[in-house]
Amino acid sequence: MATRKLYISIEESISAFQSKEKAEAYIFAMLIKASSLSSRINNPAIRSIKSILHIGNTKCCRALNNALKYEYVRYEGQTLVANILKENKDNVRPIFFERATRNQNGTLSCNVSFREMEKLIREQVIINHVKKQNLCEKTYKAVTEGEMNGEKLTVAQVKVYRRRKNRLSHTKEFHKGLSLAKVMGILQTSRYTARKMMRELVYSGKLIKNEVLDETSIDPKNFGRQARRYMKEIGYGGYFLFVNGKIMCQRSNVYICNDNLNAKYYAK
């Protein structure tokens, strides 16, 4: 199977997923890019676009109108062209898919479906988020504990990581792990879709999941009242487990990027 690589802008992808119609328009434009190296469709009648991209009439008309509205595509005479959807300052990641083929009658046939393109983009947005989170955690640990991957750092190395830390964005709160609520917020998706995607990323080996349990002081005999108080203190995120006679709280799962599998996804 011949594969093709296409770079996407993480910033533009996140922005597009904030509304359903914009996301549909964005994916439509990416499918046009995936259908040919020139990112264009000649003689773009609705029937022709439907045949190339393998989408229905209603979705095709709606996505085309929205793509024109958000300036993801434009007309150049008798040609429909997908605009450049990334800038030099953007954080970019590549997606890989099966190369488009040409039928016997000379027409193009895009070999990546609308749903598959949506999945590929969403996965790279989350992998990029986890990668940045891992980098921040490693940098802070190197500065505060003076070690990296169990090895003691030299004074010069700590200074390098301290300079890196100072270049990172600073917030009042530090969140360890990645909750489903955060994934839902980034991609504006349902809890079911977020959970399914994270499970598939872990199952494929692209992400490694570590479950983190926090020990609580909740007395099992007085669980109800103390549990409500505890949940109120932590912002109602997580759920309780009974482990070895103690009440534990599992909040966000910690994900680690599997560099062995994801190396090809990082822009050079």
Regions found by a protein language model. Name each.
Residues 1-268:
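Electropositive, intrinsically flexible nucleic-acid-contacting patches
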